[in-house]
Design a protein with these regions (language model features):
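Intrinsically disordered, low-complexity linker/loop segments enriched in Gly/Pro
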Residues: 1-42
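C-terminal functional regions that serve as terminal interaction/effector modules
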Residues: 28, 34-38, 42-207
Length: 207
């Protein structure tokens, strides 16, 4: 597997509040990368790079403890995932979420006599412009075998399949948390943590 770091980068966050999860690590013979919600495990024999069991002297969690036993075998196709994502496009919004585009925010202060004072000031987030850099508005959850997955998890699964040049992936445990996906004839495991179903979000069925 050449340049597997590109694949691993899909699964971890270099700004993660847990320092030990800011880079890939070696764990029980598996090269692992996780942000705490999604996880990939690749047999080290498939990887070109070298990885530490204690990156930066820190001890990562034992990922084997969260890998569920295979209990089913459901094929998920790239086409199914792509179709679901097309039904739930990312929405971009430049309006400042703090001031709602007005450029001003109102704050209050209660003095020692319990009098409340209101003051309108320039919004500190957008500096009064009313706009911010584009951010994603999440309005959807994706249903896989009755479980809800977030947009980022589903998009990462599709990106990993594209990187691995595979059109199908096996869902081998849909009941556990996390859910376990495995490519055919490849010692790779992808685990996605389901979300609590949010009644305020629209749902899109994958399978």
């Amino acid at each position: 597997m050449k340049n597997e770091r590109e694949l691993l980068m899909l699964f971890y966050d270099s700004d993660n509040f847990r320092e030990v999860l800011r880079q890939p690590f070696l764990n029980d013979g598996k090269v692992c990368a996780t942000d705490g919600h999604i996880l990939i495990r690749i047999d080290s024999s498939l990887c070109e790079g070298s990885y530490d069991e204690k990156p930066g002297g820190l001890t990562p969690p034992r990922t084997a403890s969260v890998v569920p036993t295979a209990t089913t075998d459901i094929t998920v196709t790239r086409q199914q995932i792509e179709r679901a994502l097309e039904q739930a496009p990312e929405e971009r919004n430049r309006q400042c979420p703090e001031c709602k585009g007005s450029g001003d925010v109102t704050w209050e202060y209660r003095d020692r006599h319990y009098n409340t004072h209101m003051m309108e000031e320039t919004c500190p987030v957008c500096d009064g412009s009313g706009t911010v850099d584009d951010y994603t508005v999440i309005k959807y959850q994706f249903i896989v075998c009755g479980k809800a997955l977030g947009y980022h998890a589903v998009k990462t699964l599709l990106a990993a399949m594209s990187w691995l040049y595979i059109d199908t992936i096996r869902l081998v445990n849909a009941d556990a948390q996390p859910m376990l996906f495995k490519p055919e004839n490849m010692d790779v495991e992808i685990l996605l943590m389901p979300q609590i179903k949010d009644e305020k979000l629209d749902t899109v069925k994958v399978i």
